C-alpha cells in the first residue's frame, strides 16, 4: 500500500509540473476514472483511482501570455507655460513592435518639437489621435501592450548557395561535311548589259537626308500645389508680424575690419582646440563683444512693457543665437553671457547647435533672451536688415567677410571686411545710443584687447 501511495504521488507531481509549465497539453481520458498506478505489477482490484471530475481539462494553456501582458495608455507630456497645444505626427503604426525609449510620435509646437518615446517594450494596440491632430498636455495618445524583452531583430537570411549548374547532356559530335575542292580557274565575269557611262561629280545629286522630326515647342509645367504651414512657421510669421506692427524699427550700419580677429584665431586656434577640445570661431567674439556693449548701453538690453507702459531693464545678459533648421529658424539662448569667457561661449554654442540639428531643443532652451545675433554671412549674405525678435529691443546682423580695398593710414589696402547691421526699437533706443552701441562692438572685435582692458 505504501508503494502504491508513492507511485500516486510521483504521477501527480509529474502532472502538476506539466500543468505549471503552461506549454504542455493536458488531455483527459474518456474513461470514468484515471488509474495512476495501473500496470502489470499491481492487481486491478486494488487500484488507486482519482475521479476525472477533479482533474482540469486544459488544452495548450499558456500562463505567461495571461499573467505578464499589460495594456497601458501613454499621454501627452506636459508643455511649457507658453505652449498650449501641438500637432501629432506618428512615427509608428498599430501593430508595430517598439522597444523602450523608442520614439513613437512627435508633437510639433509653436517653438519646438517634442518626441514621445515608448515607456516599455511592447506592441502598439491603438492610436487615439489621428495624424496631424491637435493635442494638449495630458491628452491620451496611444495604447501599448507591454511584453517582455524587446524582440531581437532577425538577422538577414544568408543568401542560398548558388545551385551547381546542371551538366548539359553531351551531344555526340557530328563529323563536318567534306570540304569542297579548291577551284583552279577563275569563273567567267558576266559582261554588263549596258555600257557604264561616267558622269561629272557635279552632276551627282546627293541623297537627301530624311527630314528630322521637329521638336515640339517646350511647354513649361503650370501646376501648383499647397502645403500646410507647420506650427513653427506659423508662429514665426505671427511673431515677426507682431514685431513689425508694434516696434518702430530702424537699422543702422557699420563695417568691421576682421584682420586682427582672423590673425588671433589663426595663431591660437590649435592651442585652443588642444586645451578645450573646441574650435575657435568668430561667433564667440561677437557674443562677447555684444555683452560688453550691452553693459555700456543698458537701454539696448531693456524692453518696453506695453501693458504697464514701463521700461524693463534687465541686469542679466541672455543672448539668443539664430540657428537655421529644416523646420525653420530657432533661437536658443546663451544665458549670463557677462560671466563667460570665449571657451564657455563656444562650448554652449556647440551644445545648442548640436541639439538644434538633432531637433532636440527643449522649450527651456529658447525661452527668454534679451538680445539676438543673426549670422547671415554663413549663407553668403553681404547686406541685410534683420527683424527684431520680440520681446527684445534690438538684433545684430552679421554678414559675409569679403576682401575689399580700404584706406588705412592714407594708403589703399585690401582688408577682410564685414558689414554689420543693428535693427532697434526706436521707441526706446535713440540713434545716438544705437550708433554708440554698434561702435563698441566694432572696437571690441577689431581689437580684442579692448575687452581685457575694459576700454
Swiss-Prot record:
Pathway: Amino-acid degradation; L-lysine degradation via saccharopine pathway; glutaryl-CoA from L-lysine: step 6/6; Carbohydrate metabolism; tricarboxylic acid cycle. The gene is DLST. This is Dihydrolipoyllysine-residue succinyltransferase component of 2-oxoglutarate dehydrogenase complex, mitochondrial. Its cofactor is (R)-lipoate. InterPro entries: 2-oxoA_DH_lipoyl-BS (IPR003016), 2-oxoacid_dehydrogenase (IPR050537), 2-oxoacid_DH_actylTfrase (IPR001078), Biotin_lipoyl (IPR000089), CAT-like_dom_sf (IPR023213), Single_hybrid_motif (IPR011053), SucB (IPR006255). The modification N6-lipoyllysine is found at residue 111. Residues 174-193 have a biased composition (Pro residues). The modification N6-acetyllysine is found at residues 155, 269, 274-275, 279, 309. Its main location: mitochondrion. It is found in: Mitochondrion matrix; Nucleus. Binds 1 lipoyl cofactor covalently. It comes from the Eukaryota. It catalyses: N(6)-[(R)-dihydrolipoyl]-L-lysyl-[protein] + succinyl-CoA = N(6)-[(R)-S(8)-succinyldihydrolipoyl]-L-lysyl-[protein] + CoA. The active site is at 426, 430. The modification Phosphoserine is found at residue 82. It is an enzyme of class 2 (transferase). It holds the Pfam family 2-oxoacid_dh. Its EC number is 2.3.1.61. Residues 71-145 form the Lipoyl-binding domain. One of its GO terms (biological process) is 2-oxoglutarate metabolic process. The 2-oxoglutarate dehydrogenase complex is composed of OGDH (2-oxoglutarate dehydrogenase; E1), DLST (dihydrolipoamide succinyltransferase; E2), DLD (dihydrolipoamide dehydrogenase; E3) and the assembly factor KGD4. It contains multiple copies of the three enzymatic components (E1, E2 and E3). In the nucleus, the 2-oxoglutarate dehydrogenase complex associates with KAT2A. Interacts with ABHD11; this interaction maintains the functional lipoylation of the 2-oxoglutarate dehydrogenase complex. Keywords: Acetylation, Acyltransferase, Lipoyl, Mitochondrion, Nucleus, Phosphoprotein, Transferase, Transit peptide, Tricarboxylic acid cycle. Belongs to the 2-oxoacid dehydrogenase family. Residues 1-68 form a transit peptide.
Amino acid at each position: 500500500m505504501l508503494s502504491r501511495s508513492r507511485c500516486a504521488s510521483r504521477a501527480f507531481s509529474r502532472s502538476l509540473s506539466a500543468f505549471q509549465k503552461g506549454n504542455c497539453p493536458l488531455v483527459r481520458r474518456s474513461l470514468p476514472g484515471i488509474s495512476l498506478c495501473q500496470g502489470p505489477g499491481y492487481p486491478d482490484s486494488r487500484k488507486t483511482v482519482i475521479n476525472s471530475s477533479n482533474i482540469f481539462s486544459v488544452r495548450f494553456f499558456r500562463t505567461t501570455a495571461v499573467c505578464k501582458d499589460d495594456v497601458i495608455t501613454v499621454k501627452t507630456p506636459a508643455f511649457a507655460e507658453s505652449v498650449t497645444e501641438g500637432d501629432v505626427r506618428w512615427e509608428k503604426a498599430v501593430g508595430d513592435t517598439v522597444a523602450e525609449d523608442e520614439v513613437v510620435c512627435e508633437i510639433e509646437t509653436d517653438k519646438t518639437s517634442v518626441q514621445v518615446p515608448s515607456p516599455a517594450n511592447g506592441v502598439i494596440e491603438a492610436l487615439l489621435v489621428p495624424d496631424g491632430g491637435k493635442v494638449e498636455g495630458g491628452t491620451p495618445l496611444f495604447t501599448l501592450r507591454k511584453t517582455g524583452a524587446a524582440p531581437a531583430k532577425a538577422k538577414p537570411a544568408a543568401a542560398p548557395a548558388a545551385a551547381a549548374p546542371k551538366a548539359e547532356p553531351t551531344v555526340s559530335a557530328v563529323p563536318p561535311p567534306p570540304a569542297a575542292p579548291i577551284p583552279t580557274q577563275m569563273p567567267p565575269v558576266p559582261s554588263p548589259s549596258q555600257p557604264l557611262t561616267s558622269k561629272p561629280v557635279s552632276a551627282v545629286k546627293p541623297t537627301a537626308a530624311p527630314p528630322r522630326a521637329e521638336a515640339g515647342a517646350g511647354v513649361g509645367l503650370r501646376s501648383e500645389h499647397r502645403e500646410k504651414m507647420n506650427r513653427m512657421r506659423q508662429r514665426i510669421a505671427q511673431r515677426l508680424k507682431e514685431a513689425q506692427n508694434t516696434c518702430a524699427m530702424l537699422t543702422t550700419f557699420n563695417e568691421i575690419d576682421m584682420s586682427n580677429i582672423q590673425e588671433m584665431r589663426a595663431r591660437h586656434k590649435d592651442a585652443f582646440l588642444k586645451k578645450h577640445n573646441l574650435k575657435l570661431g568668430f561667433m564667440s567674439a561677437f557674443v562677447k563683444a555684444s555683452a560688453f556693449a550691452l553693459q555700456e548701453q543698458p537701454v539696448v538690453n531693456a524692453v518696453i512693457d506695453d501693458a504697464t507702459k514701463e521700461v524693463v531693464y534687465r541686469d542679466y545678459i541672455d543672448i539668443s543665437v539664430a540657428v537655421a533648421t529644416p523646420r525653420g529658424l530657432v533661437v536658443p539662448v546663451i544665458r549670463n553671457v557677462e560671466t563667460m569667457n570665449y571657451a564657455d561661449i563656444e562650448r554652449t554654442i556647440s551644445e545648442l547647435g548640436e541639439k538644434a540639428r538633432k531637433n532636440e531643443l527643449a522649450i527651456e532652451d529658447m525661452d527668454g533672451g534679451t538680445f539676438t545675433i543673426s549670422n547671415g554671412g554663413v549663407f553668403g549674405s553681404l547686406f541685410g536688415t534683420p527683424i527684431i525678435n520680440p520681446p527684445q529691443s534690438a538684433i545684430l546682423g552679421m554678414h559675409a567677410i569679403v576682401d575689399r580695398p580700404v584706406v588705412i593710414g592714407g594708403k589703399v589696402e585690401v582688408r577682410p571686411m564685414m558689414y554689420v547691421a543693428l535693427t532697434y526699437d526706436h521707441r526706446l533706443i535713440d540713434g545716438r545710443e544705437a550708433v554708440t552701441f554698434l561702435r563698441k562692438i566694432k572696437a571690441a572685435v577689431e581689437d580684442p584687447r579692448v575687452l581685457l582692458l575694459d576700454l
